[in-house]
Amino acid sequence: MRKNASALKRSRQNLKRKIRNVSVKSELKTIEKRCINMIKAGKKDEAIEFFKFVAKKLDTAARKRIIHKNKAARKKSRLNVLLLK
């Protein structure tokens, strides 16, 4: 890597963004698992409310391009299928 100022700045920016993106992706995985566990435990009413929260988080991540919009749509669809069973 070059040692000029702009290359160093880009490196710092990339590191900050990577840390933030990993954090958001980890949070998404955690809340998806919580929603699935609620559904499997038979807590439908709680799961429906929590699904709205999960969908909102997925849409936000897709809008910020942390995950692809199709991935967000796929995850919401699969959670919804589980919820309606």
UniProtKB/Swiss-Prot annotation:
<keyword id="KW-0699">rRNA-binding</keyword>
<comment type="similarity">
    <text>Belongs to the bacterial ribosomal protein bS20 family.</text>
</comment>
<dbReference type="GO" id="GO:0015935">
    <property type="term" value="C:small ribosomal subunit"/>
</dbReference>
<dbReference type="GO" id="GO:0005829">
    <property type="term" value="C:cytosol"/>
</dbReference>
<keyword id="KW-0694">RNA-binding</keyword>
<dbReference type="GO" id="GO:0070181">
    <property type="term" value="F:small ribosomal subunit rRNA binding"/>
</dbReference>
<dbReference type="GO" id="GO:0003735">
    <property type="term" value="F:structural constituent of ribosome"/>
</dbReference>
<keyword id="KW-0687">Ribonucleoprotein</keyword>
<keyword id="KW-0689">Ribosomal protein</keyword>
<dbReference type="Pfam" id="PF01649">
    <property type="entry name" value="Ribosomal_S20p"/>
</dbReference>
<comment type="function">
    <text>Binds directly to 16S ribosomal RNA.</text>
</comment>
<dbReference type="InterPro" id="IPR002583">
    <property type="entry name" value="Ribosomal_bS20"/>
</dbReference>
<dbReference type="InterPro" id="IPR036510">
    <property type="entry name" value="Ribosomal_bS20_sf"/>
</dbReference>
<dbReference type="GO" id="GO:0006412">
    <property type="term" value="P:translation"/>
</dbReference>
<protein>
    <recommendedName>
        <fullName>Small ribosomal subunit protein bS20</fullName>
    </recommendedName>
</protein>
